[in-house]
Amino acid sequence: MKKQPKMTAIALILSGISGLAYGHGYVSAVENGVAEGRVTLCKFAANGTGEKNTHCGAIQYEPQSVEGPDGFPVTGPRDGKIASAESALAAALDEQTADRWVKRPIQAGPQTFEWTFTANHVTKDWKYYITKPNWNPNQPLSRDAFDLNPFCVVEGNMVQPPKRVSHECIVPEREGYQVILAVWDVGDTAASFYNVIDVKFDGNGPVLPDWNPAGQIIPSMDLSIGDTVYTRVFDNEGENPAYRTELKIDSETLTKANQWSYALATKINQTQKQQRAGQLNGDQFVPVYGTNPIYLKEGSGLKSVEIGYQIEAPQPEYSLTVSGLAKEYEIGEQPIQLDLTLEAQGEMSAELTVYNHHQKPLASWSQAMTDGELKSVTLELSEAKAGHHMLVSRIKDRDGNLQDQQTLDFMLVEPQTPPTPGDYDFVFPNGLKEYVAGTKVLASDGAIYQCKPWPYSGYCQQWTSNATQYQPGTGSHWEMAWDKR
């Protein structure tokens, strides 16, 4: 007989809700950072210009999860897999050409790098590497491309950093396009997080005198004949239609994303005096079959440019409702089974995969679903070991294009024999400030945990309802503070 969940199951709409965040962090530029990481720009627009990376694959939904083996450069990700950290989720990041990724301006000398954490692990250190002056940007990233002496090392001192942290570093002299590799070595696992940062030296100001970056044409999707793509140009008063450039999709060739991006950039350069579009080549703006930055003339009074679409055929909406997933399942003699109910909105292919914390797949299911269909699904796990697990859902349209991906977290726990009074000192978190080395508590999973000796005993008191990483038995880092009795 299968084990029943210990807690009441809850329903979650995957299109808008994700589970508890167990991992982990990415290079950002929210407050002080000089440049965002490659993976960050897959999900978030660049600060100041609105530029984004495209065609990143599933990692665009989880930029915090570029995690791989630690020990770089002696060990760590293989050459050619450095940007992805050998994660299949991030494989698209390993593509490397001179014009593939958005580049952020930077200058040599003192600069600030910023990390944003979704789970702020105990940290060993952060290291920053940069490509050699003569590196080849059209070859996969390898150790030979980098100066393997880090230009900046920040000690983590085996403590948790805040959810956002800044590092002051001295960036070496370079010219043109370079890649910075930021490595966050966490202290409580055998893994590190790898973020590459695409930068261009020589300027935080305008790329040409009198021209300022103001937007980007991102070839994010194919269009259909009859659709229109256009610029939305803004001044101090808001959108100014007088500066709009429209491109009607009137041929099969123009339906392809890279084709209409090139054509729209070309039309801007032909028809607008205060706007230019394309990659900078010397003193010229050259449209490309890919992402085209947009620039505005200094003194024009124009502030920014966005891209709009007039779609003749409305785009379908997709969502998947999953109910029946519990927060905890107790391990027993029979395999663990997840009894789920799915409800589809839109014609889709729904995929479910269960992973343990080490990313090993334990169960999977996929099937086409029609709009409004209800389906009962049972996933039987191939193994059951106590700890954190994830249910990953993917929604694809009938052409196989990924529409959404979400991750929900749950725990597998060992069966517990109820302890007798006197076997423990407190019911956690009662008496929190009295916890010292050797204190025994009864945790929410029904087990007894003993506070570790110094220097780890201080973690036992580090708990609030909003910071539960050291909560005995269920926190993401409980083993740093407690021994299970």
Curated annotation (Swiss-Prot):
SUPFAM superfamilies attached here?
E set domains
Is the Transcription regulation keyword given for this protein? no
Q: Which Pfam families match?
A: GbpA_2, GbpA_D3, LPMO_10
- What is its subcellular localisation? Secreted
Query: What are the record keywords, sorted?
Result: Chitin-binding, Secreted, Signal
Per the record, GO CC terms? extracellular region
Q: Is Signal a UniProt keyword of this protein?
A: yes
- Which PANTHER family does the UniProt record give? CHITIN-BINDING TYPE-4 DOMAIN-CONTAINING PROTEIN, GLCNAC-BINDING PROTEIN A
- What the protein does? Probably interacts with GlcNAc residues. May promote attachment to both epithelial cell surfaces and chitin.
Q: Which HAMAP family match?
A: GbpA
Q: What is the protein name stated in its UniProt record?
A: GlcNAc-binding protein A
Species, as recorded: Vibrio cholerae serotype O1 (strain ATCC 39541 / Classical Ogawa 395 / O395)
